[in-house]
Curated annotation (Swiss-Prot):
UniProt-listed SUPFAM superfamilies: Ankyrin repeat
PROSITE patterns the UniProt entry points to: ANK_REP_REGION
Alphabetic keyword roster: ANK repeat
ANK repeats: 94-159
Lineage of origin: Bacteria, Pseudomonadati, Pseudomonadota, Alphaproteobacteria, Rickettsiales
Organism: Rickettsia bellii (strain RML369-C)
Protein name per its UniProtKB record: Putative ankyrin repeat protein RBE_0261
InterPro entries (UniProt xref): Ankyrin_rpt-contain_sf
Length: 331
C-alpha cells in the first residue's frame, strides 16, 4: 500500500517538478505520513528514488513530517533515520526546529545524536527564542512560579516540567557544550566568564585556549528578559507572567509628618500591571501624605537586589550597563 501510494505521489509531484510545501498542513498530512513511513521503514526502492530526485528535495518533506510527530517519537525512530538526511534547519508553523522540540519535550537523549547530522543553535522561533533561550525560560519559570507550572493555556502548559530543575540544567549544559565544540561563533550577548560564573558549570573540552575565536567575541546567549535594562525599559515582566495570574502587591504608605510607614497587602493587583516607578517626595517640610505602590514580586526583588551588588568578581566580568540578573537561586 505504501509503495503504490508513494510511487504515485512521486510521479505527480516530484517528476512533474511541483515543489511540495516544507510545513505540515492538514491537506498534505496524509502524503507526509506515507513518505515518512517508507523512510522510517527503510524501503530501499523509495529511498533510491528519493536519492535520484535529490536528497535536498526529500529532506524538506521528511524533516517536516519528523517535526509534526516529534512529541510522540522515541529515540529508536531517530536512530533508524536512514542516510542522516533529516535537517535541523527545517522549522514548523511556530518557527521551531528539531532542537527547539528537544528542549520543549525534554528529549535530552536526542541531543546526543544532533552532531552527527549537523545543527544550528542560533535559529530563533517566532518569539525570538533560540533553544538556549527556551532552556533558560524553563528554569526561570520553574523556580519563579512553581505553583503555576501546570496552568492551562500558558507557555507553562506547553513546556513539560517533569523533573523541571534537573532537566533544565542538563539542557543548558548540553547546549553550551555543543556551542563550545561545534559552533563558537554566534551572536552572543555576554562573555564566557560571565556565563561560567552564573552557571557554576565548566563545559567539557575543548578549553578556551583551543578555540581560535578571540575571547571577547565569544559570548554565551542569555535570555533578553534577564537584562537590567529591560526592566528599565518595560518596567514589567510581562513576557514571563502567566496570563490572568494574580499576585500580591505591597502598598507602602509614607507619612512624612509622623515619620513612619504602614505596609498593607493588595492581592487584587494583576501581574501584568507595570511597575510604578514613582519616587517619594523627600521634602521633610511637606505635610502631605505620599503613597506609592510597587508590584515587585519575589523574583523582581531578588533581581533588583542582585543588580545592585558590589561583588568585585562580578563587576570584573560584567559590563556596567548590562548586568546579568540570573542569580544562584535560578541556577
Amino acid at each position: 500500500m505504501y509503495n503504490s501510494t508513494s510511487f504515485t505521489i512521486i510521479k505527480h509531484y516530484y517528476i512533474l517538478g511541483i515543489k511540495m510545501p516544507k510545513k505540515c498542513t492538514q491537506v498534505f498530512d496524509e502524503f507526509l505520513q506515507v513518505i515518512h513511513q517508507n523512510i522510517v521503514g527503510e524501503d530501499k526502492a523509495i529511498i533510491d528514488i528519493l536519492n535520484t530526485l535529490g536528497v535536498e528535495q526529500a529532506n524538506d518533506l521528511i524533516s517536516a513530517a519528523f517535526l509534526k510527530h516529534f512529541k510522540f517519537m522515541h529515540l529508536e525512530h531517530w536512530q533508524r533515520y536512514p542516510l542522516n538526511i533529516v535537517s535541523t534547519d527545517i522549522i514548523d508553523e511556530q518557527g521551531e526546529n528539531v532542537i527547539h522540540k528537544c528542549v520543549r519535550y525534554d528529549k535530552i537523549d536526542f541531543l546526543k545524536h544532533i552532531p552527527s547530522i549537523g545543527f544550528n543553535l542560533g535559529i530563533p522561533n517566532k518569539d525570538g527564542d533560540t533553544p538556549l533561550h527556551l532552556a533558560y525560560k524553563k528554569l526561570i519559570y520553574a523556580q519563579s512560579y512553581p505553583a503555576f507550572t501546570k496552568a492551562k493555556n500558558t507557555l507553562l502548559n506547553i513546556v513539560n516540567f517533569k523533573n523541571k530543575d534537573e532537566i533544565s540544567s542538563q539542557f543548558i549544559g548540553v547546549l553550551i557544550n555543543l556551542e563550545y565544540i561545534f559552533k563558537p561563533i554566534i551572536d552572543f550577548n555576554y562573555n564566557v566568564a560571565t556565563f561560567n560564573h552564573f552557571m557554576h558549570h565548566k563545559p567539557s573540552a575543548p578549553i578556551l585556549s583551543d578555540i581560535n575565536t578571540p575571547i571577547n567575541n565569544f559570548k554565551p546567549l542569555l535570555p533578553r528578559i534577564t537584562l537590567l535594562r529591560d526592566i528599565n525599559e518595560t518596567s514589567s515582566f510581562r513576557d514571563l507572567a502567566p496570563p490572568g495570574h494574580k499576585r500580591k502587591t505591597n502598598s507602602i504608605e509614607y507619612n512624612n509628618t509622623k515619620k513612619h510607614k504602614t505596609i498593607s497587602n493588595d492581592s487584587h493587583h494583576n501581574l501584568y500591571s507595570s511597575i510604578e516607578n514613582k519616587r517619594l517626595d523627600n521634602d521633610l517640610n511637606s505635610t502631605s501624605k505620599t503613597t506609592t505602590t510597587t508590584s515587585y514580586n519575589e523574583l523582581d526583588k531578588l533581581l533588583i537586589a542582585f543588580s545592585n551588588t558590589n561583588n568585585a568578581s562580578i563587576n570584573n566580568v560584567l559590563d556596567t550597563d548590562e548586568v546579568a540578573l540570573i542569580g544562584n537561586k535560578f541556577i
